[in-house]
């Protein structure tokens, strides 16, 4: 469960290392986000020479959470960290590589480019 002021690692090579959540998109008064949800965040830590700079406001999709998500068959999938991928307005990633596994729930949100770039889909 990701909410305002949550810090997440960035799982792509866009140049950002860590982001801070500003807002959870999808309805007024929505408090929390889970895997596959889009958030607005600001870059808190970035690598030099990257596409994304520190202080920039970006949109991102959540790909891993510690709290996990429940699947239709009753199983749960949880990860060791909270991570996101920075996206453009057309739901495509800003970077060209994705690091670490991503959840299968991203397919339902039409983030097919992220799923295809990921080394592992759980």
Curated annotation (Swiss-Prot):
Superkingdom assignment: Bacteria
Q: Which family does it belong to?
A: Belongs to the universal ribosomal protein uL14 family.
Keyword RNA-binding recorded: yes
| PANTHER family in the record | 50S/60S RIBOSOMAL PROTEIN L14/L23, LARGE RIBOSOMAL SUBUNIT PROTEIN UL14M
Report if keyword rRNA-binding is assigned. yes
Alphabetical list of InterPro entries matching this protein: Ribosomal_uL14 (IPR000218), Ribosomal_uL14_bac-type (IPR005745), Ribosomal_uL14_CS (IPR019972), Ribosomal_uL14_sf (IPR036853)
Q: State the protein's name.
A: Large ribosomal subunit protein uL14
GO BP, one example? translation
User: Which keywords belong to this entry?
Assistant: Ribonucleoprotein, Ribosomal protein, RNA-binding, rRNA-binding
Q: Subunit notes for this chain?
A: Part of the 50S ribosomal subunit. Forms a cluster with proteins L3 and L19. In the 70S ribosome, L14 and L19 interact and together make contacts with the 16S rRNA in bridges B5 and B8.
Give a GO cellular-component term: cytosolic large ribosomal subunit
Q: Which GO terms describe its molecular function?
A: large ribosomal subunit rRNA binding; structural constituent of ribosome
Physiological role: Binds to 23S rRNA. Forms part of two intersubunit bridges in the 70S ribosome.
């Amino acid at each position: 469960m990701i909410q305002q002021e949550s810090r997440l690692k960035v799982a792509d090579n866009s140049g950002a290392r860590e982001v801070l959540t500003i807002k959870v998109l999808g309805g007024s008064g929505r408090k929390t986000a889970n895997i596959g949800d889009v958030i607005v965040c600001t870059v808190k830590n970035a690598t030099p020479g990257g596409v994304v700079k520190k202080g920039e406001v970006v949109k991102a999709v959540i790909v891993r959470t510690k709290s996990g998500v429940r699947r239709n068959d009753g199983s749960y999938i949880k990860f060791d960290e909270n991570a996101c991928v920075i996206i453009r307005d057309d739901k495509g990633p800003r970077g060209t590589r994705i690091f670490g596994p991503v959840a299968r729930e991203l397919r339902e949100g039409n983030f097919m480019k992220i799923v295809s770039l990921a080394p592992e889909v759980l």
